[in-house]
């Protein structure tokens, strides 16, 4: 069986591949291009980009959850330990934490949830992911350092602003309303839509 980080990376890559194919088909349809063809180069670039960025994003999400736990025990005398402290090399919110939640009962920690939302969706996470996207896509397309620098200056904030239409609200819904066992499905659906946008953006780089 794959480790959690490998499984998450493969899932993210599959979603990215699907979103890139959809984006290429939509772009060709808008240009009334017949017959439709899939650019293998664009497809492979997007797949490689996801393979490179999914593992650090996985670790980033775990770090956020460790520093700002999303749930707290209803009984303040109880402590729900992060799984990192229970089993060092295992996945976040695994069986041990879930068993503790069932035993003690937990509630959403709104303060920590909003901190994670702000750091990840609104500021640092959005900035780092967008910069990685522009830099890696530029390198894979053979752009010069000057051209990549120009893309960073001109495209970073427009992409971040576009992400504000999707990820902040999706993140709040995910943390506050979606059961733990269904969050991957929810985020995967949102990621598919966002992947289409990034694919269309990458095609213009």
Q: Language-model segments: what does each one mean?
A:
Residues 2-29, 39-78, 82-83, 109-141, ...:
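Alpha-helical transmembrane segments of eukaryotic organelle membrane transporters
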Residues 31-34, 146-148:
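Membrane-interface helix termini and inter-helical loops of multi-pass transporters
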Residues 33-36, 72-107:
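Intrinsically disordered, low-complexity domain-flanking/linker segments in eukaryotic proteins
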